[in-house]
């Protein structure tokens, strides 16, 4: 009976050790994923910078993600080109203003 208890205790110890190793591996994978997301965040395009070549790469603002806003520019030669920049659309800018004002009033 004593040998059976020792073997069971040994098996429980081995199983718990192997499962903790699996959890550590999982945490390492999550950490690598978070680091990749942080790298992507650093590569985003800030407000008022050009986003013509990457229209979905604008950074996040205080409350919303900036939108790539495009305009058509006519050069002196009469050639039309599209130029885009990251910015806050007017309706979202108004929402941020209202929320900021509400925070000042209500703390």
Curated annotation (Swiss-Prot):
One Pfam match, by short name? Toxin_35
What is the reported tissue distribution? Expressed by the venom gland.
Task: State the signal peptide span.
Answer: 1-20
GO cellular component labels = extracellular region
Propiece span(s): 21-41
Can you list the disulfide-bonded cysteine pairs? 44-59, 51-68, 58-86, 70-84
InterPro entries assigned to the protein according to its UniProt record, in alphabetical order:
Spider_toxin_CSTX_knottin, Spider_toxin_CSTX_Knottin_CS
Compartments (UniProt record): Secreted
Molecular function in Gene Ontology = toxin activity
**Where does the source fall among the domains of life?**
Eukaryota
List the keywords (alphabetical). Answer: Disulfide bond, Knottin, Secreted, Signal, Toxin
Q: Would the keyword Disulfide bond turn up in this protein's UniProt record?
A: yes
Q: Is-annotated flag, keyword Disulfide bond?
A: yes
Q: Which family does it belong to?
A: Belongs to the neurotoxin 19 (CSTX) family. 04 (U1-Lctx) subfamily.
Domain topic, free-text comment: The presence of a 'disulfide through disulfide knot' structurally defines this protein as a knottin.
Tell me the protein's name.
Answer: U1-lycotoxin-Ls1o
Q: Which organism is it from?
A: Lycosa singoriensis (Wolf spider)
Q: What is the lineage of its organism?
A: Eukaryota, Metazoa, Ecdysozoa, Arthropoda, Chelicerata
């Amino acid at each position: 009976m004593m040998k059976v208890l020792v073997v069971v205790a040994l098996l429980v110890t081995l199983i718990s050790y192997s499962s903790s190793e699996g959890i550590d591996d999982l945490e390492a994978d999550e950490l690598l994923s978070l680091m990749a997301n942080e790298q992507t965040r650093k590569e985003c395009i800030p407000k008022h910078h050009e986003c013509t070549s990457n229209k979905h790469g604008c950074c996040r603002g205080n409350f919303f993600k900036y939108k790539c806003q495009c305009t058509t520019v006519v050069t002196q030669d009469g050639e039309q080109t599209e130029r885009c920049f990251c910015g806050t659309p007017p309706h979202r800018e108004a929402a941020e203003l209202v929320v900021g004002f509400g925070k000042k009033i209500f703390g």
